[in-house]
């Protein structure tokens, strides 16, 4: 189980990312359109003004049961060991264990 503080920090980052998403997107489009290098540097400075935690790169996918940030399966939103336990307990319909 992940610490509650880390999970809350992740929620805060997600809110910040949603808040500044349009600003970052518009700045990136402007950089692509502007031909002169000096104007690109100016727009790049604007792109650096939002907080660091508003960058989408800083977000992690977490298991929604345990909060574990690693070994997540996107299709299920679960970490690997939780997914395996749920499949063994037949809690995920349609998922089967491989056997050969």
Curated annotation (Swiss-Prot):
The keyword Chloroplast applies. InterPro entries: Ribosomal_uS14, Ribosomal_uS14_bac/plastid, Ribosomal_uS14_CS. One of its GO terms (cellular component) is small ribosomal subunit. The keyword Ribosomal protein applies. GO terms for biological process: translation. Residues 1-29 are annotated as: Disordered. It comes from the Eukaryota. One of its GO terms (molecular function) is structural constituent of ribosome. Keywords: Chloroplast, Plastid, Ribonucleoprotein, Ribosomal protein, RNA-binding, rRNA-binding. Its main location: plastid. Binds 16S rRNA, required for the assembly of 30S particles. Part of the 30S ribosomal subunit. Belongs to the universal ribosomal protein uS14 family. This is Small ribosomal subunit protein uS14c. It comes from Acorus calamus (Sweet flag). The lineage of its organism: Eukaryota, Viridiplantae, Streptophyta, Embryophyta, Tracheophyta.
